Amino acid sequence: MAATLAPPRAAERPGRPRGGHRLFAIVLLLAAALRVLVMLGYDTARLYWYDSFTYLDTAVHLRPQGAFHPAGYPWFLWALRPFESVELIAAAQHAMGLGTGVLIYVLLRRRSLPGWGAALAAAPVLFDPAFVRLEHAVLSDTLVIFLVTAALAVLMWRAEPSARAAAAAGLLLAFAGLTRTAAVPLIGLAALYVLLRRGWWRRAAAGAGALAVAGALPLLVYAGWYAQHHGRFALSGSDGVALWARTMTFADCSVIRPTREQAALCPNGVDLDAASEYVWDPRASLNRLPGDRFSHNDLARSFALRAIAAQPLDYLSEVVKDTSLAFTWEPVAHPARMAPSTTFPRGSWPLPEEHALVGKVRQEYDPDIRGMCSVEPYASILAAYPYPWFLHGTLFGVLLLLGGAGAAARPRPVLLPWSFAVFLLVAPVAALDFDHRYVLPAIPAACVAAALAVPPLLRLAYRVAGPGRTTLRV
């Protein structure tokens, strides 16, 4: 008996999706049920010291933070402040998580992928516990993921994005950058995509210009607001400290030859297991200087740039080594005090009441703020939820490889989401350190790129196999 395999049909030009959406409706319903179960399985949203409380405090007293946290996420929290409920924040973010899955699905259907393929590409965002747990926490990750995915969908909805679509994508990426500054360079990648994608050079320049202007204006306004409060035209005051911490895993001052002022930031014998630990450890050389660590941001940046210029291969080696932690078959703790997993834990997580900011936020944002506890019997059901780590780590590496192969074979539809995924994965590691949390924004773009890579790779395989039809014995 023989089955005939005809060449796959081209899927380059976006069009109306073929077939119904019944399968994805079932998938979305299951994903929503999982999130309802999470809301029942935990008695409140997860609050982390000190990130969550800094975000909530900034939402009450709107001002740009001088350190790691720009004000994009606090604006979202400010909009929900009248309800005085961190549980509502979690519910809204669960809705965003579902929305991200929907965006992936509709974009891929628009690109003529079958319903099962588009639903499969959306599945990691909808069912990976790492995403769902972040949605249930007062952290900025879910908002960043939603904004970046929305920008991708807007830019790729048509084969040649209009100037209006490009401007909308620029705004979305700007707000993503104001939520997490690592997303700011995506504006440049998107503008380059529009410039190369559109047919006539005048239309291409107009589209890229619209995206660049729409992306730059919110950043410039924010930088001016930041300057009013901190006397410096910038988006944050922590970039130098972060990059200095990155260099502490390889810096050799006998090679770097720092200036007398920079020499105070040389490694002092403290050996920590992750670059990010040097930011907070009181024994690290930066933290032994007088004043607040972030008051030395410019000095830290100058040292870090000098170190990278003197030891570029050591720097690249550390970035590659830490980035590879994203693809492991089993979870690797980094730093050792953090235990990554794709499970829903049971237990209680009390708040550090010794910090005055906890009581201040409770008084000003939500009087019912408390440490999160699991609730039975729902927590036991969640604890039994099966999602092996390799579907989170190793599969992500496979998706990136598939997207990279597709970008090489047919770059037009695949290159933008693949470049977004690679940048979102590598940039945080290059700027500070690897964190399992920071991998998540790259996964939706990687799913889109991998899904779009399949048709051109199948066509390439068919051409290599030979013209006409291929007969397979089954």
Task: Specify the residue positions occupied by each region the protein language model found.
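Membrane-interface anchor segments at the N-terminal boundary of transmembrane helices
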Residues: 18-21, 87-88, 317-418
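Extracytoplasmic catalytic/substrate-binding loops of multi-pass membrane glycan-assembly enzymes
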Residues: 41-56, 64-87, 235, 296, ...
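Membrane-interface transmembrane helices that cradle and orient dolichyl/undecaprenyl
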Residues: 111, 151-166, 195-198
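Membrane-proximal stem/loop segments at transmembrane-domain junctions that anchor or position
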Residues: 235-364
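Multi-pass, polyprenyl lipid-linked donor-dependent membrane glycosyltransferases
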Residues: 50, 89-99, 120-155, 162-164, ...
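Transmembrane signal-anchor helices characteristic of membrane glycosylation enzymes that use polyprenol
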Residues: 20-46, 127, 214-225
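Transmembrane alpha-helices of multi-pass, membrane-embedded glycan-processing enzymes
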Residues: 77-84, 89-103, 144-147, 390-400, ...
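Start-transfer (signal-anchor) and selected internal transmembrane alpha helices
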Residues: 1-36, 207, 456-457, 461-474
